[in-house]
């Protein structure tokens, strides 16, 4: 039994701002659909919360503390049957600086 290997590009996106992440996902999906590839997603992954506990006072008041948190929002987009035109369009795509992108072929 021979299985046909299907070409796929997996794009993982991370950002602190959810709206910035969603607009970047829309741009990627629109670009993939315009070039003839099929895009599956964006698939939301669990949001990571990182909480930092800091003393409010520089001196002895250990009971007075302040909490800060960062939330990292993540998405996955799978692009099936990408052509060379699709890859060129994705490389030329201008995305905001606050979005971290990881691409796997």
From Swiss-Prot:
Gene3D superfamilies: Ribosomal protein S10 domain. Keywords: Ribonucleoprotein, Ribosomal protein. It holds the Pfam family Ribosomal_S10. Coiled coil: none annotated. GO terms for biological process: translation. InterPro entries: Ribosomal_uS10, Ribosomal_uS10_CS, Ribosomal_uS10_dom, Ribosomal_uS10_dom_sf. One of its GO terms (molecular function) is tRNA binding. GO terms for cellular component: ribonucleoprotein complex; ribosome. SUPFAM superfamilies: Ribosomal protein S10. Part of the 30S ribosomal subunit. Involved in the binding of tRNA to the ribosomes. Belongs to the universal ribosomal protein uS10 family. PANTHER family: 30S RIBOSOMAL PROTEIN S10 FAMILY MEMBER (PTHR11700). This is Small ribosomal subunit protein uS10.
